[in-house]
Amino acid sequence: MKITKRIAFDAAHRLLGYDGPCARLHGHRYILEVTLEGTRLDELGMLEDFKSVSSKLKEGPFASWDHRTLLSKEDPLVSFVEEAYLMDKNPTAENMLLEFVEKWGYGFNTAFTRLHSVKLFETPDCSAELIL
C-alpha cells in the first residue's frame, strides 16, 4: 500500500551554465510529493498519519526552501542574495530531489513504512521523480 502527501512552496532559482531563460533568476510555485509504502496498517487503519508526514515536510524542505532563492554555491549571486539556500550543484528539480533524500529522506522511514518516491513539480506540467 502507498500513501502520498503534497506540499507547495514558492522559491526562486537560476541555472549556472544553462543556455536559455533558466539562466536568469526566476521563480516557481513548486509542488513536492512524497510517497511512502508499507504492508502494515496501524490500529487506526493508517499506513502513516498524514499529519505526521506533513509535519516532517514543513520542518524539512518547506522551512528550508519556501520563499528562498535556491542557488549553487558557485553562483556569483550568493553574496548579493538574502535568504538563499545554497546547494553543491545547480538547483534543478532533479538535484533538489537528491538533496531532499540526502537531508530529510531518512526521517520518513519507520518500522512499517519506507520512503518510496519523491516527485517535484516546477510547473503544472514539468516534474522530476526519484523512485527509491
Spell out what each predicted region is:
Residues 1-132:
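Charge-rich, low-complexity N-terminal segments
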